[in-house]
């Protein structure tokens, strides 16, 4: 069997004894977090190591040099970013080029039917001129695109848990629920479940390398993986109907 092993660093230790260098992208934290990840997973190296957020308190050169030190030490093969802006990614590549070092190979952005701007607009110049992979997260919009929140928040669901108030405020907007209902009807018409349609829509984008799938049951994962088989059915007509329902297609950047 073959797999790609990744880890990420930024938020670090959350306890009351949290120290300044136990979070962020300082050289100290990136090096220590990588070492600890290797120990936890009992491996010699990571295929991919993410800077989980940008860090305004650390110079970009320090981040680039640290990630390349880890590459040279054989602890990671590639490094990436997560939730970085297009400008921050370009800056990292410019710094890396000036130093003769490796820039980030992949970005991990949120991407789904309700969150399209980064993949479909902001990053287009990067995809064209630099070339960069993406590992998207939340293809089901925190479960909204499963349809399970159409009639409220079920007990035991993620949005019902303490500490997820921010997600409820972000995800449950009446207009979105109306669109989810319409998308569900389209999925029924196409003979698939809404999560399958939603994930297939994401991975159809040629700039999406892979998608992070979350599931609480094995059956949910098995169902969602049917998106790969369904992908050929996402023709131009179906994609146009989805865009018509969503009404949020990003404007392409002008050059």
Task: Please identify what each model-predicted range represents.
Residues 38-59:
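Active-site groove signature of glycoside hydrolases
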Residues 1, 33-39, 123-131:
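Short amphipathic alpha-helices and their capping/turn segments at secondary-structure boundaries
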Residues 1-14, 107-111:
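A short, structured active-site edge motif that brings together acidic residues
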Residues 60-246:
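Beta/alpha (TIM)-barrel catalytic core signal, keyed to glycine-rich beta->alpha loops juxtaposed to Asp/Glu
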Residues 24-41, 89-94:
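Short, acidic/polar
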Residues 16-31, 52-58:
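Active-site mouth loops of central-metabolism enzymes
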């Amino acid at each position: 069997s073959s797999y790609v092993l990744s880890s990420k660093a930024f938020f670090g230790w959350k306890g009351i004894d949290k120290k300044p260098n136990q979070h962020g992208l300082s050289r100290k934290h990136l090096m220590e977090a990588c070492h600890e990840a290797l120990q936890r997973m009992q491996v010699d190296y990571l295929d991919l190591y993410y800077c989980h957020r940008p860090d305004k308190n650390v110079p970009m050169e320090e981040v680039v040099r640290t990630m390349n030190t880890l590459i040279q030490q054989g602890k990671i093969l590639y490094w990436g970013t997560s939730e970085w802006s297009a400008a921050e990614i370009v800056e990292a590549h410019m710094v890396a080029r000036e130093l003769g070092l490796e820039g980030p190979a992949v970005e991990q952005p949120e991407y789904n039917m309700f969150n399209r701007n980064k993949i479909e607009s902001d990053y287009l110049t990067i995809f064209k001129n630099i070339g960069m992979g993406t590992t998207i997260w939340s293809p089901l919009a925190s479960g909204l695109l499963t349809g399970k929140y159409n009639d409220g928040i079920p007990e035991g669901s993620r949005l019902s848990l303490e500490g997820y108030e921010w997600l409820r405020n972000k995800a449950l907007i009446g207009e979105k629920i109306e669109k989810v209902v319409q998308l569900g009807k389209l999925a029924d018409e196409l003979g698939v479940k809404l999560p399958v349609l939603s994930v297939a829509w994401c991975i159809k984008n040629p700039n999406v390398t892979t998608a992070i799938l979350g599931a609480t049951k094995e059956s949910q994962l098995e169902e969602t993986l049917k998106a790969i088989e369904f992908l050929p059915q996402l023709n131009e007509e179906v994609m146009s109907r989805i865009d018509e329902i969503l009404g949020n297609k990003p404007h392409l950047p002008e050059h």
